[in-house]
Amino acid sequence: MKRAYSPKDIAAKKWVTLPWGEKWNKPFGFPAENASWFISGASASGKSSFVMQLSKELCKYGLVLYLSYEEGVNQTFQRRMEYLKMNEVQGKFRVVVDETYEELIDRLKKPKSPKFIIVDSYQVSEWEYPDAVALMKRFPKKCFIWISQDCLLYTSPS
């Protein structure tokens, strides 16, 4: 039987949190460094710009790997990087456009591997939900940020 936590057990847990400033702690508090995020929104709603700003902030706390499966490194991606001055985090920010699930695992097993992994987008990665869960369990000290487009579910009339 799995352990059941009491309120006292939960209150006693300690977390290593991101010590970021007011701009980020007001809306998000101080999340655990190894928290997993799921960011979802409609197409063209500003997700990519927000996530690029978040990436830049996360570079203060460790290496960031941005898996740009949806956009690649197209002109829009390039302009966004220029606009947000991502050159200021040179050496802390890397972009990959076509890495497989297995290649990502190999990368994350290395000693100086990224601390923050952004998957943009979950749908385009073509990973199954169990793959994502297995990745987070295998690398529990890393932060995974999953970007998703809103999807409409259609149920045929009965």
Regions found by a protein language model. Give the residues of each.
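Pre-Walker A (Motif I) flank of P-loop NTPase domains
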Residues: 32-37
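Conserved small/polar residues in nucleotide/adenosyl-binding loops
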Residues: 154-158
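Charged, amphipathic alpha-helical linker segments immediately N-terminal to NTP-binding catalytic cores
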Residues: 1-11
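Conserved P-loop NTPase "ATPase switch" module shared by AAA+ and STAND
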Residues: 113-126
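Pre-Walker A adenine-sensing motif
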Residues: 17-31
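Conserved Walker B catalytic segment
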Residues: 127-139
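Structural recognition of the conserved hydrophobic beta-strand(s) that form the central parallel beta-sheet
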Residues: 142-150
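Conserved P-loop
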Residues: 38-98
